[in-house]
Amino acid sequence: MTTQNFLAEIGTEELPPKALKKLATAFAENVENELNQAGLSFEKVEWFAAPRRLAVKALGLATAQPSKKIEKRGPAVSAAFDADGKPTKAAEGWARGCGISVEQAERLATDKGEWLVHRAVIEGQPTKNLLVDIISRSLANLPIPKMMRWGDKTEQFVRPVHTVTLFFGGELIEGEILGVKIANVVRGHRFLGEREFTISHADEYLTALREKGSVIADFNERKALILAKSQEKATALGGVADIEEDLLDEVTSLVEFPNVLTAKFEERFLAVPAEALVYTMKGDQKYFPIYDKDGKLLPHFIFVSNINPEDPTAIIEGNEKVVRPRLTDAEFFFKTDLKQRLEDRLPRLETVLFQQQLGTLRDKTARIEALAGEIAAQIGADKAKAERAGLLSKCDLMTNMVFEFTDTQGVMGMHYARHDGEDEEVAVALNEQYMPRFAGDELPKSLVACSVALADKFDTLTGIFGIGQAPKGSADPFALRRAALGSLRIIVEKNLPLDLEDLVRKSAALFGDKLTNANVVDDVVDFMLGRFRAWYQDEGIAVDVIQAVLARRPTRPADFDARVRAVSHFRTLDSAEALAAANKRVSNILAKADVAIGEVNPTACVEPAEKALAEAVLGLRTEVQPLIAKGEYTAVLDKLASLRQPVDSFFDNVMVNAEDPALRQNRLAILNTLQGLFLQVADISLLQ
């Protein structure tokens, strides 16, 4: 089988930087899928992406589809010809569908008789004839939320398309994609190298782009270059660059030939909280801040230019000039905000609506204050500090700094609280109330902060569910899924002795008559328990394990987690499968029971197997009670695993539905006790 390398490049206007990597990887995945569906073998598909291009390269792509042997069975010979030996309509219709005459059909002898059959070999198409359609479909299926048209064209894409290049080895593929004729023309850098040049082979692409067009098309190569140079520049300044993965990807998506440079700002700006300065540098300017070895912000930053002049002074000064007004604004807002205490901003919260039916932000802070105090009392935190932090929790939303730099909410509250002389735990809680902000984010460190964070999240969950506005589909305007998962993480990972029903009930009481959903407690608890599924699945825990625990509906998250860990461990034991099947059988038997089931009477047992099981379940019931009380579910299930042999023996040797009612009742009681032992942890009958 002969192969060639295949290249496809789509040259565009500047693509959205935050979406570039996703578009490129999706393009490659789509091409892989299309090649597989076409039956075309290949070694691998590589992807390339720069601000003005998406490209894929399929290495070792077969030059043709493989031939296919087909065999279409027709009617039986007895039904294919009439008494005169002429083909019947059924035979003629089948032959016509195969593109042959009845006389051309072969015969297939089977033990059930003889049949007409059509055998043929369908030659595979040359790969080059399929490539235009493969790329067109791959582009059509990209995850593009908003498409656009350009010029007088009817085609749509994420940005206007100017060039399309498809090479299969050294052959330029003819055709049109997105209204653009395929050509051997590739566009270079906007300002460096050749603006436009031609290539003659798929393997020339990367080298020609770099040498002629001054473009590094390999996204990962540009990313690695930016990272290495940034770290090198930061080290030269005696610091460490703050390079977040998402920002690094975005910066990589903004440049075709990266030039990493450093610039500085006036040291007087360091009097402003570092978070505000960093917000401006990262969010607005896409700069990388630099910190010293003690974690203090340095008056320098790293930026990446898309041009590479011999003297970069003008570029450096230009970036310093651009960032200076933003830092000056931050300095002004900070100094202005310090003139008023956080507590004095409480009345202004009355002018901001949290939700029309649920009142203002001032109403919300009053509820957070009360609920945070309740939670603090339960988890051993300082109640007064939790209430104080709850009261001040939203005051920084009324400051100039947070109004201008919204992502600094919480952290600015912490700085202003410190300036006001608030207790340190109170100040820190104002920042940590929003944790975790995203999946994998750190949790609040102090119990006071945990109290406020949970109070805030439960207030939102209870309030929104209480007015019947639960999330639907992907719509979740109040981020309830994040609030639920964040709450669960705090309770579980901090091992807090909190009950969801209790928290929702207390939260609901604080709304007075504002809530209209009478089932708010059950609705919120069910919603939160449902979030466990996604959490544990991400950890690789089997769905049936989660379902087994959900069936018991434990409402204390730390307890729920302990049960999941225990069942996940139990599932690995040799006896697990047999005991799960036995529990399923027990459930079915008990569901059909036609007598009242009481306590086990050991003296009423007749068969040795039922005596053995009765003794085992009664003994274990006593033995595991202390473990259940302490939540040591793994130890409980380890002990219950010993029931496999007596359970198997019972079902092999004992008829449960005996004719004697007393005997039947006692045997059902044994099974009921057996089931009850496991149900104290989970419904293991649901394990697959």
Curated annotation (Swiss-Prot):
Superkingdom field: Bacteria
Catalytic activity entry: tRNA(Gly) + glycine + ATP = glycyl-tRNA(Gly) + AMP + diphosphate
One Pfam family of this chain: tRNA_synt_2f
GO terms of biological process kind: arginyl-tRNA aminoacylation; glycyl-tRNA aminoacylation
EC number(s) on file: 6.1.1.14
Enzyme class: ligase
SUPFAM superfamilies with a match to the protein in the record: HD-domain/PDEase-like
Keyword Repressor: no
GO molecular function: arginine-tRNA ligase activity; ATP binding; glycine-tRNA ligase activity
Record's subcellular location: Cytoplasm
Keyword tags: Aminoacyl-tRNA synthetase, ATP-binding, Cytoplasm, Ligase, Nucleotide-binding, Protein biosynthesis
Record InterPro entries: DALR_anticod-bd, Gly-tRNA-synth_bsu, Gly-tRNA-synth_heterodimer
Recorded GO CC terms: cytosol
HAMAP family, per the entry: Gly_tRNA_synth_beta
Subunit structure: Tetramer of two alpha and two beta subunits.
Entry's family note: Belongs to the class-II aminoacyl-tRNA synthetase family.
Designated name of the protein: Glycine--tRNA ligase beta subunit
Species name: Actinobacillus pleuropneumoniae serotype 7 (strain AP76)
Taxonomic classification: Bacteria, Pseudomonadati, Pseudomonadota, Gammaproteobacteria, Pasteurellales
